[in-house]
Every structure is written in structure tokens, then in C-alpha cells.
């Protein structure tokens, strides 16, 4: 028998160290390339606040700016949806009106915070360059201010006393009587108006003697005089009442929702429902349509995954 050849020894430790070194170098090079490709973001300067209240005010202002950006994005989304779906164009003015109210509240809050900072003599951050949709509101009437200043100067020159004069418009009793008399005489409640309309229809069809009025109790003498025609009158009144009733589908909501769960809109032509982590939430028409699209995509993806698993 021949001698066995010796197996060459392999130094596993050195080979592993080499592989780890090469892999580490490759990862470092990849990170450097990614950093070079990405644009360097400017570092925000660290602001030292003088007091706790100053920090709270600046944080509130930043939050208002972020909320305002969200409102502008929401308005843009509603406009795009109204262009895609013609039915949503009717509700667009109401949606924009709600967003305008929210922007006015944010503007008032931001102006009060900036005024507080100015009173504390604290430098305010640079204002945002977001365009404002609504026109500025002039709270001061210059003509009133100038006339008031002129009257104060005249009074100071005369007796060094300030006198204030107020002009009020009063309505006399004759004017009130004329306005009350100008109201229509036939303005009656809705229930009585409908009953009178039904009675006029009955008198036109059956005659004034045989047609009893609805809502009034008939005496025994009237019932004996009418005898056999009462059956026809009752059938006519029931048919008129049934035709007056509006036939419509039952409402989806027992109570009208206050606002949309996603965008916070309070007015919409049609309210919808959705789920958020198993909880039912109220959605406006635009958000509800978007939710239905996303739900349909997820359902199709689940079906594709299930069919591929079965075939495999």
C-alpha cells in the first residue's frame, strides 16, 4: 500500500479576515458615493431661547406653518378630484369656504403670537413665503380715526376736555308698524297651509256641500246629511295624502357627521364610511372615493397573491 498524501492545511482565520476587510471597504465606498450623490442640506442654526415662553411661542408658530401647508395640499387635492369627477364640482365652493375659515383662524393666532413676541422684544423667525389665498383684512378705518383725532384736538383747544359724540339710528313706532303691516297676511304655518290646499282640492272635485274639511271634527247632523258619499271622500283624501308624501331612500346616517375624519370638511354632498384600524369613521365624498380606490387595489393584490400561492 502506498503512503497517503498529506492534505494541505487551510488557514480559515486569515481568509475570513480578508473577506471581512474587503466587504467593509466596499460598504464604506458605497456610503461615500451615496453621500456625494445626495445634495447637502443646509444645517439649521441652533437657536438659544431666553425663556421657556419664547420657545413655546416659536414651536406654536412652526406648527401653524405646517398646518397651513397641509391645508393648501388638501385644497389642491380637492380641486384635482373635482376636475376628474364632475359631481364633486358642486361641493367645491363649500370645501374651499371651510378651508378659508381655517386659514383665517391660523392667521389670527399667528398674529397674536407675533404681537406677544414683539411685546417681549424677542426677534421673530423669518416669515414663511407661502402665498395666501384670501385677501388681507383691514381692521382699522382711517376716516373714523382721522375724524376722532380732529374732534379731540378741537376740544383740547377750546376747554381742554374731551367730549365724545355718538350717532345712533333709531326706528320710530310708525316705521315698525309699517314694517309689521307689510308682512303677507297669508303667512301661515306649513301644516295649516297643506291642509287648506287639500280642502280646496276636495271642494273643487266633490262640491262645497259634501266635502268635509280635514282637521275639523264633523257633527252628527253633518254625517246624516252626507250619508253615502263619505266613503268616496275618505278615499280621495287618503290618495291625496299619499301622493303628497315624498318617496325617497332611507338615510345612511341617523345623525349627520360633524366633519370628515381625514380632511375635516363639514359640508359635502354625500357622506361615506371607512375603517381606520377596525374602527368605523366618517368620510367626505372626495376622501371616501379615494378610500374606495385604495381598498380595491389592496383587495386585488391579495387575490393575486392567493392565486400565485395556489399555483405554486
Swiss-Prot record:
GO terms for molecular function: DNA-binding transcription factor activity, RNA polymerase II-specific; RNA polymerase II cis-regulatory region sequence-specific DNA binding; zinc ion binding. Residues 1-45, 213-232 are annotated as: Disordered. A zinc finger (GATA-type) spans 260-287. CDD domains: ZnF_GATA. PROSITE patterns: GATA_ZN_FINGER_2. GO terms for biological process: negative regulation of transcription by RNA polymerase II; positive regulation of transcription by RNA polymerase II. SUPFAM superfamilies: Glucocorticoid receptor-like (DNA-binding domain). InterPro entries: Znf_GATA, Znf_NHR/GATA. One of its GO terms (cellular component) is nucleus. Residues 29-45 have a biased composition (Low complexity). Keywords: Metal-binding, Zinc, Zinc-finger. This is GATA zinc finger domain-containing protein 20. It comes from Dictyostelium discoideum.
Amino acid at each position: 500500500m502506498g503512503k497517503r498524501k498529506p492534505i494541505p492545511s487551510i488557514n480559515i482565520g486569515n481568509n475570513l479576515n480578508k473577506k471581512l476587510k474587503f466587504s467593509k471597504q466596499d460598504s464604506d465606498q458605497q456610503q461615500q458615493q451615496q453621500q456625494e450623490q445626495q445634495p447637502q442640506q443646509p444645517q439649521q442654526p441652533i437657536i438659544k431661547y431666553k425663556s421657556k415662553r419664547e420657545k413655546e411661542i416659536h414651536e406654536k408658530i412652526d406648527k401653524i406653518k405646517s398646518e397651513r401647508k397641509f391645508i393648501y395640499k388638501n385644497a389642491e387635492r380637492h380641486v384635482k378630484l373635482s376636475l376628474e369627477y364632475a359631481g364633486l364640482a358642486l361641493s367645491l365652493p363649500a370645501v374651499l369656504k371651510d378651508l378659508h375659515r381655517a386659514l383665517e383662524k391660523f392667521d389670527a393666532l399667528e398674529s397674536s403670537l407675533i404681537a406677544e413676541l414683539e411685546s417681549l422684544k424677542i426677534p421673530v423667525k423669518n416669515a414663511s413665503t407661502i402665498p395666501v389665498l384670501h385677501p388681507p383684512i383691514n381692521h382699522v378705518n382711517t376716516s373714523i380715526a382721522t375724524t376722532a383725532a380732529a374732534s379731540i384736538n378741537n376740544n383740547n383747544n377750546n376747554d381742554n376736555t374731551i367730549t365724545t359724540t355718538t350717532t345712533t339710528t333709531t326706528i320710530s313706532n310708525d316705521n315698525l308698524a309699517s314694517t309689521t303691516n307689510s308682512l303677507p297676511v297669508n303667512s301661515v304655518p306649513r301644516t295649516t297651509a297643506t291642509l287648506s290646499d287639500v280642502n280646496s282640492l276636495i271642494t273643487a272635485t266633490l262640491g262645497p256641500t259634501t266635502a268635509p274639511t280635514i282637521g275639523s271634527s264633523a257633527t252628527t247632523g253633518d254625517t246624516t246629511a252626507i250619508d253615502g258619499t263619505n266613503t268616496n271622500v275618505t278615499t280621495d283624501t287618503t290618495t291625496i295624502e299619499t301622493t303628497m308624501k315624498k318617496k325617497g331612500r332611507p338615510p345612511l346616517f341617523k345623525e349627520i357627521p360633524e366633519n370628515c375624519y381625514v380632511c375635516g370638511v363639514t359640508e359635502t354632498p354625500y357622506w361615506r364610511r371607512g375603517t381606520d384600524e377596525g374602527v368605523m369613521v366618517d368620510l367626505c365624498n372626495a376622501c371616501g372615493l379615494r378610500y374606495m380606490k385604495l381598498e380595491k387595489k389592496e383587495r386585488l393584490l391579495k387575490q393575486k397573491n392567493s392565486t400565485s400561492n395556489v399555483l405554486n
